[in-house]
């Protein structure tokens, strides 16, 4: 029976959240899409959806369906997880989904805190920073799907919601959970909360522990297992997060065009094939498939569509933003299945949209969360095509430059 249910707007975000919760030693179950039955054998349930860039009506519908399933598992506290770089424009769905979940749960207010200090994301006076750069001055300003041109979370959120947006700043958070709880009780429906360090997140989580709904990045949920144990909602038993031993074959698939993923692709030393969206649109992925068929999975080849911003803009200009992403996702999803059939048992995927497409193509419905490769990126165990598979789903900007080699080395 679950005590906590989370809805994540993409697959890498779901594994990020599940990995941080699993640090506590509690069992975490990660579902790919909404399951059909209500059975749960874990206190923490995370449902991964693929709605980050979905139209508002579609995103709200899927999130409410996930909420209904999570309530059926016994969960009474819920979390709406989105990216630590917010990744949402004025037409985005973060606010509408939050309002729909609030209405379904009868919640008067909720908090918004995408901060993830361990990965360099912080919120100060309502402004989101990536490292020392305001969000709008960071590489996220050139994100191909959700270019972030404003750093102020209140301004980003206000056009998306129908009720007032407010701020509880770092000065209040620094006074502790009791002071924060008092401030939240007087705040409007949608409350952005500052956090610049993990200690701030613990204060926010403690103040909001009994809220029906909290929203934010994965790091905001990280203190919750300890708080639930403290309140007697979770037992003291702990387990080591592990993934079953799998075969030696491996493949790396990268659809992200983030600055960090570009550096990771450049640093990787395995056999490589680059996908060009314009070629994929005209000719399909036959050339990549033929190349992959000749590869030794023991050498962990990489297939990537990762490119510089100018190349991305050129492809989007000729194909349209949606089509440019679709041809890449379709190709990488098909190539993931081919690689599995050729013996790849460790599959590393970079990019949220790509991870969603690959996971669905592999027919994965549940992931068991294992050890973290980097903060927010765990190895996960699953079954695909009757085979035990280890899957790592990486958000574009996560990990250091050697991430791909680090990941494969961990399960060598």
Where are these regions (language model features)?
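Glycine-rich, highly charged phosphate/nucleotide-binding loops
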Residues: 34-35, 55-70, 328-331
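Cap/lid and interdomain-hinge subdomains that line or gate substrate/regulatory clefts
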Residues: 1-5, 31, 43, 59, ...
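C-terminal structural cap/anchor segments
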Residues: 299-350
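Conserved, well-structured core segments that form the ligand-binding/active-site neighborhood
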Residues: 131-290
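Short glycine-rich or small-residue beta-strand-to-loop segments that form or flank ligand, phosphate
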Residues: 3-8, 45-53, 76-87, 194, ...
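Short acidic, glycine/serine/threonine-rich loops at helix termini
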Residues: 17-19, 90-94, 121-129, 179, ...
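A structural-propensity feature for long, helix-poor, extended segments
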Residues: 40-51, 298-299, 381-412
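Conserved, well-ordered active-site substructure
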Residues: 344, 355-403
